[in-house]
Amino acid sequence: MTANIIDGKAIAKQVRSAVAQRVSERVAQNLRAPGLAVVLVGLDPASQVYVGSKRKACEEVGFISKSFDLPANTTEQTLLELIDELNNDQEIDGILVQLPLPEGLDVEKILERITPHKDVDGFHPYNIGRLAQRMPALRPCTPKGIITLLDSTGVRYKGLHAVVVGASNIVGRPMALELLLAGCTTTVCHKFTQDLETHVRRADLLVVAVGKPEFIPGDWVKEGAIVIDVGINRLDSGKLVGDVEYSVAEQKADFITPVPGGVGPMTVASLIENTLEACEKYHS
């Protein structure tokens, strides 16, 4: 058996097209286009690539896009003042501060400064709390995108045993909340988990987000499972691989996301969806 590929690029394109259509309708009704402000501090090469893709996606769907590229030595106070300005900017519906930030900047303090209704990354404690209480507002982008990918398979995943490997604030923890909301029986594995293999082998639905190349051997994957690989790792050879040993896993899984072209495009698509939602729900 060879797994069905969950094509994140194609699904993300559909999402962007739907958003672009809605933006066109708004403009035709003399309503303003949604606005997204992207803040980049420093010259981290990976961050520059990610920010570039987000800005490009904004332009494609017709958003107002404002960019703020700040030097690495930017003070925390300067960054907080910029966020305050954007919180009060009526053309801006979403504020994104690209992570990681340079050393010396308090990430928690900075992210919490963003007003929750403009927190289109979904990282603010208010938005995470809403998700935990089964009243989601603006949802974290990567987990939200993964739910869209799962829905695309047509598989009824309510009641499935879902295993999330990785417990970061950005992916693992909110992913577990999304899966609970969807009706899965959910296990979260992390660096202190004993006998990881046993947990993984039981997973009907496996989500891996640890940032380590081929960390999960493919033969651990349960026959017929759905595998969502969030990782994207560059080997010394230059090849990009995920956190799961793909070549073996695809022979056992029923559905699997490729790397690249799986989860990554959906993260940006979800950001675009969140910005439109923030505009229409909170700022129109």
UniProtKB/Swiss-Prot annotation:
Q: What is its EC number?
A: 1.5.1.5, 3.5.4.9
GO aspect biological process, one term: methionine biosynthetic process
Query: Which controlled-vocabulary keywords does the entry list?
Result: Amino-acid biosynthesis, Histidine biosynthesis, Hydrolase, Methionine biosynthesis, Multifunctional enzyme, NADP, One-carbon metabolism, Oxidoreductase, Purine biosynthesis
Q: Which residues of this UniProt protein bind NADP(+)?
A: G166, A167, S168, I232
Pathway where this protein functions = One-carbon metabolism; tetrahydrofolate interconversion
- Pfam families listed in its UniProt record: THF_DHG_CYH (PF00763), THF_DHG_CYH_C (PF02882)
- CDD domains associated with the record: NAD_bind_m-THF_DH_Cyclohyd
Superkingdom:
Bacteria
Q: Can you tell me which family this protein belongs to?
A: Belongs to the tetrahydrofolate dehydrogenase/cyclohydrolase family.
Subunit architecture: Homodimer.
Protein's name according to its UniProt entry: Bifunctional protein FolD
The gene name reads folD
